[in-house]
C-alpha cells in the first residue's frame, strides 16, 4: 500500500514504515501529525485518485528529527571586473516516519 500526499509545496510518494524528509514543520520531535492533503492511495489493484484530493484520506506520521541540509553556495562573478560575490544557504528540514495510511 502506498499513497501520494502534498506537503510544503511538494508531492511525496510514501508507504507505511518509510521515513521521509520534508520542509521544516513547527512541531516538536516525537509528536504525531496527520496529513489530509492526500492526492492518491493505492492498495494493490484498488487505486483511489482524488480530484484533486481523496475524500477521507489521511496519512499519520511521527516527527523523528529536525535539522539543516548541506550547504549550497551561490556565486556571482563578472569576468575582468574584479567582482565576486558568494552566499551560502542551509535549508531546514524535518524527518517524518509514516505510521499509517487510511482512506
UniProtKB/Swiss-Prot annotation:
Gene Ontology CC annotation, any one:
cytoplasm
Q: What PROSITE patterns would the database entry show?
A: RIBOSOMAL_L21
The protein's matches in InterPro entries, at most eight in alphabetical order, are given as: bL21-like, bL21-like_sf, Ribosomal_bL21, Ribosomal_bL21_CS
**What Pfam families does this protein map onto?**
Ribosomal_L21p
Query: From what superkingdom does this record's organism come?
Result: Bacteria
Q: Does the keyword RNA-binding apply?
A: yes
Q: Which residues form a coiled coil?
A: none
Which NCBIfam families does the record cross-reference, listed alphabetically?
L21 (TIGR00061)
Listed name of the protein: Large ribosomal subunit protein bL21
Name of the encoding gene: rplU
